[in-house]
């Protein structure tokens, strides 16, 4: 199975392996995190080992490749071939037991000089909408009905259960975001009072999902040039990629450069080299990265979906506040501001139900803002070869490669929340 450069150009991806997804029969690519720039797991022959590696062998321009596949700029790839059968992999020995992926980089044509600039911009969004979730009114009426049913199942009469529920429902959920008193919020049938309204201060502060996500923006710039004749061919490329992820703290940046050269000084002698350098930096959203990257919020999307739609993101006054002379200082629902006049996050210790232990003392946006996880990598890859032809049908080939990598991983966990 072969994927050529035209197919690669049609798909705006940060890793050449992502191009293989759906293009090669029998090949599986697994990216369970969704972080921009992450190297997807590739399975050609399924899972052959429980504890050992199931990763295929990558071969770039004839040499086994041990670096990150995300170091390779897809714009520099001429073709990708996948070898599945044992006979095709015999050349590489036991390293090829999980299959082989052959990657061929672009080289200059034999005639002419050219310079090409490719600029691409794109946006990414969630492909499938989320399930509809309860709004605040639906949630409150459902909680009222559930608590009343619980009281009846414990022996209370329907009338007693209704009275007790109306009196105690706010203490059960932890907060009253409406313009009605706690015991006047519902009628006898469990419906919100006809004149019950969410206070203005809370209206725009109950959405946890939208502030955490965004439409991703992708910018890619590639400059390449080449010159060639019958004896010498040289190609260079420079690339820059900036990709913002679906969550606001996730992004991937890559600066890459490559040089490919082939020389034929004599009819019987051919030599060449390829050099590639990459600097990349990845910012992870700790809450979305999963337990492999963080022990803070293990699943931010679950938190955003699970938290009840009555709990605000920021701190609010839960009662009217009056000055000593009786004048109104703050209305119920107003934001509680800090000394600089900014909004303060609410960790739920005072506003959420005591039974909701999973969210109390936690805050998706606050933790995402304070905690940091990022890594930076510098890579240099080089291949060189010499082919000497002698007699009529013999060629002596000598190949060598070099791989240098420097990686810096950094993580910061705050002491305020979480």
Model segments located where?
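Proteins with a high burden of low-complexity, intrinsically disordered sequence enriched in S/T/G/P/A and R
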Residues: 1-3, 80, 103, 344-355, ...
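Intrinsic-disorder/low-complexity, polar/charged segments
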Residues: 15, 135-136, 363, 407, ...
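A short, polar/proline- and glycine-enriched secondary-structure boundary/capping micro-motif
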Residues: 127-129, 283, 365, 408
